[in-house]
Amino acid sequence: SYVGIEVPNPNTSLVKLRPMLESDAFQQMSSPLAFALGKDVSGQPVVADLVRMPHLLIAGTTGSGKSVCITAITACLIMNNTPQNLRIAMLDPKMVELMRFNGVPHLLGKVETDHDRMQGVLKWALMEMDNRYRLLEDAHARDLVTYNRKQERKKLTTLPRIVLIIDELADLMMTSP
């Protein structure tokens, strides 16, 4: 048996995104929603697939790199997908971290900062999810890949993946009923 104890390292090391994206670990991921998270304790790239984790919560203390992580994930998603294949909705209650993505063609509108409009975006996302479940059911498709494959065979319109990114969810929850 082993016991592992994590000790903060006073000597931080910079993890650059490009080498992560060029790593074998990332290149071997075939998913359009693959993203690089960083390096493990032995310096090996850590990659993940948003398809396998449809809900992701990034938590940590102030200054621990949550927003940097969200930015890296978003950059990976944008670089691996066209705006026709991936649409992103972003909510930023603090009006700070996600504003840099305004103007990116993958966005469904602009980065939303108004609390009332954020409620509208969340309601739209729920309606869109329900609508997509009905479409999948009608097409006898288990997932979006199968649905789109069937649509392509019939030369019909496919659906893009939709990713909703919320920075500072706690702030949004505190100000919304």
Model-derived regions, located:
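P-loop NTPase catalytic phosphate-binding loop
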Residues: 2-6, 20-141, 159-177
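Short, charged/polar, Gly/Pro-enriched secondary-structure boundary elements
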Residues: 10-17
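Conserved alpha-helical scaffold flanking the Walker A/P-loop in AAA+ ATPase domains
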Residues: 121-124, 146-157
